């Protein structure tokens, strides 16, 4: 198990840990925190929000579960200004931001490394049906969206140069692989 507390990683300051719904981003975030890293969950720590794609307006109280057709109009978006603030706060230590948003390309330039967690369809179905920390994916429309995006996420991030990690493995191994990706980029343990 690799552990560290706020260590500057040879110039790498901000790592984006992304992947489809159900790949384990929030779980990885929690383990990174437990190991002493600065790790933030984009879903829980105010980095993302629902927006109306037609108007750009923020959705203050989104429905849960979403009704049919809702995801065609509304999207989960990351707020660039929040990530820019995190970049400034992370100049002397490494930080991990864990999440996924449809406008990730708008903030990709702010990250020193992108890690994409991937899982197979059976694992995705199982995780979305049984997870207790987030209800997204239990409703048929949400599940359909997650299944549609699962193969696309890997392709998008591989093309963009991300480090792809098989997140169907035990979480400690997945987190070790995330840390190894940072070490591989910097030549030192984060």
Placement of each model-derived feature along the sequence:
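Hydrophobic anchor at the beta1->P-loop junction of P-loop NTPases
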Residues: 17
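P-loop (Walker A) phosphate-binding loop of NTP-binding proteins
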Residues: 20
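ATP-binding Walker
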Residues: 23
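Conserved substrate/cofactor phosphate-moiety recognition/catalytic segment
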Residues: 30-81
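Glycine-rich phosphate-binding loop used to anchor ATP phosphates in small-molecule kinases
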Residues: 66-111, 117-118
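Small-molecule kinase domains that catalyze NTP-dependent phosphoryl transfer to phosphate-bearing small molecules
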Residues: 104, 130-180, 185
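Conserved phosphate-donor/acceptor-positioning beta-strand/loop module used by diverse small-molecule
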Residues: 110-131
